[in-house]
C-alpha cells in the first residue's frame, strides 16, 4: 500500500508498507523513541540491529504486516499487524468468552514519533489502514498486550475508531492495569 496523507497542519506524509530497504530509517526511528514512549510501546527490541537483522530480513516470511508513515527523510509512525499466534491474548480473550483466530484477528500495535504525537497522525494512518483492510479477510484488530489504563491518548484514539474495551488485566512488571480493546469490522 502507498497512500498520501495530509496532517491537520497541512504537512504531507506517506503511509506505506515497510520494505527491506527501510532498515536504516526504521532503526533510526526506533532509536529516537523516548523512554516515555518505550514504556508504552515495547512489542520487540527497538534498535537498529533488530530493524535490520530481524524485521527487514524476515519481511516476507514472518507473517506480520508492517506499515510506516514517512516524511521525505524519516519514519514518523509505525504500525504492526501481526497474524501470528499470541497465546496470552488468546487465553485472555478466551476468558472473556471470545475465541480469537489470529489469521482473522491479528494483533495491532501503533507508535508515533515523540515529536509528532497528538497531532492526528495515528488517526490519519489508522483511517487509511482500515480502508485498505476492507479488501482483506481481517475480521478484527486486537490490541497487542492491551493498552495501559493511564494511556488516554491511545485509548481515545482506539475509541474514536470503534475499538471496544473488552476487559482489564494487571501486569506486575509495570504495576499497571491494562485494557484489552478490540475493533470488530
Ligand atoms: C498512542 C499513539 C499511537 C496515538 O497516536 P497520535 O498520532 O498521537 O494520536 P492522534 O493525534 O491521532 O490522537 C488520537 C485521539 O487521541 C485524543 N488525544 C489527542 N491528544 C490527546 C492528549 N494529549 N490526551 C488525551 N487524548 C488525546 C483525541 O481524541 C484524538 O483524536 P481527535 O483529535 O480526533 O479528537 C501515539 O501517541 C504514540 O505512539 N504514543 C506512544 C506509544 C503508544 O502509546 N503506543 C500505543 C500503545 S497501546
Predicted regions, residues:
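Conserved GNAT-fold acetyl-CoA-binding loop/helix
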Residues: 34-56
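Conserved acetyl-CoA pyrophosphate-binding loop and the N-cap/start of the following alpha-helix
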Residues: 116-128
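Conserved GNAT acetyl-CoA-binding A-motif
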Residues: 104, 133-147
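Conserved beta-strand-loop-alpha-helix junction that forms the acyl-donor binding cleft
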Residues: 117, 142-155, 171-176
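Conserved active-site alpha-helix within GNAT-family acetyltransferase domains
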Residues: 123, 135-136, 148-167
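A short, internal acetyl-CoA/4′-phosphopantetheine-binding micro-motif in the GNAT/acyltransferase core
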Residues: 68, 96-102, 107-118, 146-148
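Conserved acyl-donor/pantetheine-binding loop and adjacent beta-alpha core of acyl/acetyltransferases
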Residues: 72-109, 172-173
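A short beta-loop-alpha structural element at the N-terminal edge
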Residues: 12-28
Amino acid at each position: 500500500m502507498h497512500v498520501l496523507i495530509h496532517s491537520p497542519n497541512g504537512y504531507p506524509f506517506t503511509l506505506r508498507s515497510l520494505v527491506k530497504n527501510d532498515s536504516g530509517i526504521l532503526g533510526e526511528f526506533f532509536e529516537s523513541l523516548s523512554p516515555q514512549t518505550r514504556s508504552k510501546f515495547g512489542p520487540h527490541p527497538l534498535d537498529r540491529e533488530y530493524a535490520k537483522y530481524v524485521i527487514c530480513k524476515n519481511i516476507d516470511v514472518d507473517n506480520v504486516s508492517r506499515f510506516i508513515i514517512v516524511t521525505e527523510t524519516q519514519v514518523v509512525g509505525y504500525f504492526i499487524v501481526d497474524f501470528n499466534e499470541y497465546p496470552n491474548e488468546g487465553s485472555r480473550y478466551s476468558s472473556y468468552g471470545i475465541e480469537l483466530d489470529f489469521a482473522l484477528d491479528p494483533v495491532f500495535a501503533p507508535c508515533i514519533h515523540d515529536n509528532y504525537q497528538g497531532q492526528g497522525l495515528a488517526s490519519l494512518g489508522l483511517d487509511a489502514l482500515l480502508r485498505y483492510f476492507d479488501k482483506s479477510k481481517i475480521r478484527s484488530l486486537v490490541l497487542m498486550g492491551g493498552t495501559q489504563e493511564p494511556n488516554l491518548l491511545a485509548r481515545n484514539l482506539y475509541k474514536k475508531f470503534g475499538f471496544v474495551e473488552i476487559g482489564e488485566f494487571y501486569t506486575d512488571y509495570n504495576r499497571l492495569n491494562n485494557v484489552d480493546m478490540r475493533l470488530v469490522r
